[in-house]
Amino acid sequence: VRDGYIALPHNCAYGCLNNEYCNNLCTKDGAKIGYCNIVGKYGNACWCIQLPDNVPIRVPGRCHPA
């Protein structure tokens, strides 16, 4: 497990406006908790704590939306 910005396909972070959205998103995928990191490295994006290794996280490099 690890902490990180949960990722959409193509290395894009999930944008957010509130903690409830991120907590639901993160815990649905097995994380302990999640919150909306306001004005973080990737803008307002969901950060997950103790996210399972099989769930993709945002890594350095460009976001390539479909």
From Swiss-Prot:
Alpha toxins bind voltage-independently at site-3 of sodium channels (Nav) and inhibit the inactivation of the activated channels, thereby blocking neuronal transmission. This toxin is active on both mammals and insects. It can be considered as a cardiotoxin, as it can bind to human cardiac sodium channel and modify its normal properties. Its main location: secreted. InterPro entries: LCN-type_CS_alpha_beta_dom (IPR044062), Scorpion_toxin-like (IPR003614), Scorpion_toxin-like_sf (IPR036574), Scorpion_toxinL (IPR018218), Scorpion_toxinL/defensin (IPR002061). This is Alpha-like toxin BmK-M7. It comes from the Eukaryota. One of its GO terms (molecular function) is sodium channel inhibitor activity. Coiled coil: none annotated. Expressed by the venom gland.
